[in-house]
Amino acid sequence: MKVCIYGAGAIGGWLGVALAQAGHPVSMVARGDTLRALQAEGLRMRRADGSLAQVPVTAHSDPAALGVQDLVVVAVKAPGLPDVARAMAPLIGPDTIVLTAMNGVPWWYFHRIGGPLEGTRLASVDPGDAPDDAGPHAGTRHGPP
């Protein structure tokens, strides 16, 4: 399964290491010093026991350079989501799964931001609405991107 992690912070990095160690090719969208470090050294994570996990990843600042993915994990802070939603279109194909790994994203988040994900309903637990069955961090695309 081709996996792209959009956001290489603590959550995205942890998921990237776990998925790469499970044998999936992992790419990451990052910027600045984080992008340069990923390109030079791969993804590194210090475990609780002090050991270092290091896995190779493909890293770019431009999602279009990575192509369509089987799974896209969005692991950015909530204020960055509108920009990410517009930029991630080149990663999304008809069978791509989009998984959010962030806090505070209600099911209706994409309904009025414009772009390719306009109207997408996220299956999530939302205290202001009836909970969906998917769980707190699952994203489900209903219809074309």
Regions found by a protein language model. Name each.
Residues 52, 61-145:
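Rossmann-like NAD(P)(H) cofactor-binding subdomain of soluble oxidoreductases
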Residues 41-61:
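N-terminal short beta-loop-beta anion/metal-coordinating cradle
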Residues 1-48:
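NAD(P)+-binding Rossmann beta1-loop-alpha1 motif at the extreme N-terminus of oxidoreductases
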Residues 26, 57-59, 143:
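Generic structural signal for residues in well-ordered beta-strands
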Residues 34, 55-56, 72:
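A generic secondary-structure signal marking the coil-to-beta-strand transition
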